Structures are given as structure tokens and as C-alpha cells.
């Protein structure tokens, strides 16, 4: 097969329906909109969620829960992710953002979790550490410092 022999997949190319271009086209006069009514008008149609006057689903279902404005939000980083850094590196939230480990620093900072194993000797500065994370960091010869 050569470049000039390529053809689109069957059913991939549809013929354009030119609407309102005479009765012989099959899309003339009303252009596929049926006869009079709200949907035949320009800009016609009902708003999203409108169910013809019936009580909409969003209002039939009860409200549930709330958002706690005092919730503490942390970036959670597991210790096994930190293996990719060199021995003796000092790791801070800003450093993690710079290296692309986290996208942005959350309002309460970074929490280091203890999932996986740490083989590197690192100094890690973060807002919170789990017990297992702190133990693994110190077992590898590093330091876990709370900022």
C-alpha cells in the first residue's frame, strides 16, 4: 500500500446535509425541524434539566452532606516516590513541586505517608509525617523534620 492508495475507514466519512436548500434535497423547507413549535424556532429548545414541567431529577433527590470549611487538605506523598532523588538531598514542598511530584502545594502543605520502602538517605521537611513514614526515613539514615 502506498500513500496515494490510502482511503478513510468505511463509515468514517459522512456526506454533508445541506439544510434548507430545496425540497428535492430531503432537507428543504423545515430543514429537519418538523413543523411549528419551540424547537423549530431559532434559539428554540428547553434549558438543560427541564423535563416538561415535571419536577426535575435534581429537585426530586434530597440534598446530602456538606463541605467542611475547616477540613485540612494535604498533598500526600508516599516514601517510595522519594527513592528517585539522590542520596543526601534535602526535600521540601517547594522542591517536590519543582520536580513535578506534586502539581501545587495545598493550603496545609505536604504529608509524607509510609507506603513502600525508602532506600535513600534523605532529609525531608514537611508539615506532617505518619509514624511509619518517619520510622522508614530514619531507618534509611535520613531525617524527618516537621516544618
From Swiss-Prot:
Biological function: Binds to the 23S rRNA.
UniProt name for this protein: Large ribosomal subunit protein uL15
Keywords on record: Ribonucleoprotein, Ribosomal protein, RNA-binding, rRNA-binding
Keyword Ribosomal protein: yes
UniProt key word Coiled coil: no
Superkingdom field: Bacteria
SUPFAM superfamilies: Ribosomal proteins L15p and L18e (SSF52080)
Gene Ontology biological-process entries: translation
Recorded family membership: Belongs to the universal ribosomal protein uL15 family.
InterPro entries per record: Ribosomal_uL15, Ribosomal_uL15/eL18, Ribosomal_uL15/eL18_sf, Ribosomal_uL15_bac-type, Ribosomal_uL15_CS
Composition skew (Basic and acidic residues), residue ranges: 1-15
Biased composition (Gly residues): 23-35
Taxonomic lineage: Bacteria, Bacillati, Bacillota, Clostridia, Peptostreptococcales
GO CC annotations on file: cytosolic large ribosomal subunit
PANTHER family (alphabetical): 50S RIBOSOMAL PROTEIN L15, LARGE RIBOSOMAL SUBUNIT PROTEIN UL15M
Record note on quaternary structure: Part of the 50S ribosomal subunit.
GO-annotated molecular function: rRNA binding; structural constituent of ribosome
Organism: Alkaliphilus metalliredigens (strain QYMF)
Region (Disordered), start-end ranges: 1-47
Amino acid at each position: 500500500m502506498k500513500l496515494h492508495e490510502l482511503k478513510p475507514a468505511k463509515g468514517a466519512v459522512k456526506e454533508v446535509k445541506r439544510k434548507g436548500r430545496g425540497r428535492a434535497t430531503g432537507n428543504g423547507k423545515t430543514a429537519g425541524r418538523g413543523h411549528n413549535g419551540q424547537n423549530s424556532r431559532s434559539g428554540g429548545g428547553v434549558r438543560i434539566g427541564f423535563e416538561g414541567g415535571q419536577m426535575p431529577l435534581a429537585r426530586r433527590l434530597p440534598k446530602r452532606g456538606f463541605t467542611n470549611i475547616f477540613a485540612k487538605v494535604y498533598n500526600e506523598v508516599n516514601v517510595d516516590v522519594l527513592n528517585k532523588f539522590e542520596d543526601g538531598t534535602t526535600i521540601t514542598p517547594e522542591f517536590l513541586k519543582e520536580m513535578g511530584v506534586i502539581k501545587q502545594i495545598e493550603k496545609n502543605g505536604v504529608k509524607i505517608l509510609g507506603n513502600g520502602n525508602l532506600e535513600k538517605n534523605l532529609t525531608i521537611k514537611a508539615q506532617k509525617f505518619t509514624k511509619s513514614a518517619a520510622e522508614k526515613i530514619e531507618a534509611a539514615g535520613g531525617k524527618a523534620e516537621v516544618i
